[in-house]
Amino acid sequence: MDALTTFDHIIINANLATFSAQYGFDTYADNKDSISAAAKSTPYGQLENAAIGIKDSKIAWIGAHTQITPYLTHYQSQQITDADGHWITPGLIDCHTHIVYGGNRSNEFEARLHGANYQDIAAQGGGIVSTVRSTREANIEELFAQSEKRLLALVKEGVTSIEIKSGYGLDLKTERKMLKVARALGDKHNIHVSTTYLAAHALPPEYKDRVDDYIEQVCQWLPILHSEGLVDAVDGFCENIAFTTEQIKRVFEVARSLNLPVKLHSEQLSNIGASALVAEYQGLSSDHLEHLVEDDIKKMATSNTVAVLLPGAFYTLRDTKLPPIEELRKHQVPMAISTDCNPGTSPLTSLLLAMNMGCTLFYMTPEEVLAGATVHAAQALGLAHKGRIEVGCDADLALWDITRPADLAYQMGLNPIEGIMIKGAWR
């Protein structure tokens, strides 16, 4: 029997943005010494008039539409999707989110616009302490229901994999509750969820003036939650207003002992060596990066650490310090884009809008931001079989009614999704 007759599902008459090096994708071809690299690169790794064969939830074959048409009679109609010349990308990946939380902080948003500053809001029990309080008070069913709405908003725009952090519990009971909700969201909606332990996010009120004592607790909770199957990676907030590199290093040492990958909120407000620390531990990603310097970029390039850029926070905070995009290009550091969905500084549940912000605010190209929401986002989560349309990769795909891939970053407020495939099944 011919191999082209044995797929579980086939997609025909499609244009593909593969983001695969096998099809010429190379974001940084223009930054390489070889002139031929740029000449050989294909924007988006695109293939036109193509077809895909899917078997056992994986991409099993990619070829020309004309190659598969003689075999269509071997398939039932429900096994065939005619893309009608529209574009297919890898399913989008939101690689930095805080979507599991309780409460709402729109009152603080309003207060700031009436002139209140951070200190005023904090004095009234607002800020992150407000979210911690609401998250602790919510039971697991309430927390799931609130968080599910945010997840589904992202899925409706083509997101098939998502990272979800803890970090609004700041005690063992609530950190566990948050991570359980994250797992449950993935299970219910058949979407890949990468969980990240972020207890080193802020200092809880009960540990005021006892930062080192709290970090000791963070280190003790990690093996417990990992043993319960709740932790895929470890994160921290490394800033003058949060935790020092030495304190984060203590957490990273525990992560290393458990063979857990690390990442870090780095260089958002200042530079205290956070990205250099991530690189020292061969971390998956360093995130925010407005104050990143070239020496640390070189270290990230050596450690293959992804730069995760978060324009939603930049926008919400009205920041003016741009991340060093040109230097990241120069040293060929992969750049990812994410919503950073959180209640305080980026209440954003649109990865498409984050991509547009990456172009408009950070001067990234449409190809860079779409790569940043697919292949580079997958790298930022250590997901080797996601983020590309390539034989052997997971069949997580998004079908779009667009004329060219750049439309996804160009349009605002219009969702051109036509179909979402997760693990080989349309939803």
Swiss-Prot record:
A single BP term in Gene Ontology: L-histidine catabolic process to glutamate and formamide
Q: Which GO terms describe its molecular function?
A: imidazolonepropionase activity; iron ion binding; zinc ion binding
Q: Which cofactor does it need?
A: Zn(2+); Fe(3+)
Does the keyword NAD feature in the UniProt annotation? no
Keywords carried by this UniProt record: Cytoplasm, Histidine metabolism, Hydrolase, Iron, Metal-binding, Zinc
- Name its pathway: Amino-acid degradation; L-histidine degradation into L-glutamate; N-formimidoyl-L-glutamate from L-histidine: step 3/3
Residues reported in the UniProt entry to bind Zn(2+): H96, H98, H265, D340
Note on how the cofactor is bound = Binds 1 zinc or iron ion per subunit.
Enzyme Commission code(s) on record: 3.5.2.7
Positions of Fe(3+) binding = H96, H98, H265, D340
User: Function, please?
Assistant: Catalyzes the hydrolytic cleavage of the carbon-nitrogen bond in imidazolone-5-propanoate to yield N-formimidoyl-L-glutamate. It is the third step in the universal histidine degradation pathway.
Specify the protein name: Imidazolonepropionase
Q: Which organism is it from?
A: Psychrobacter cryohalolentis (strain ATCC BAA-1226 / DSM 17306 / VKM B-2378 / K5)
Query: Its gene?
Result: hutI
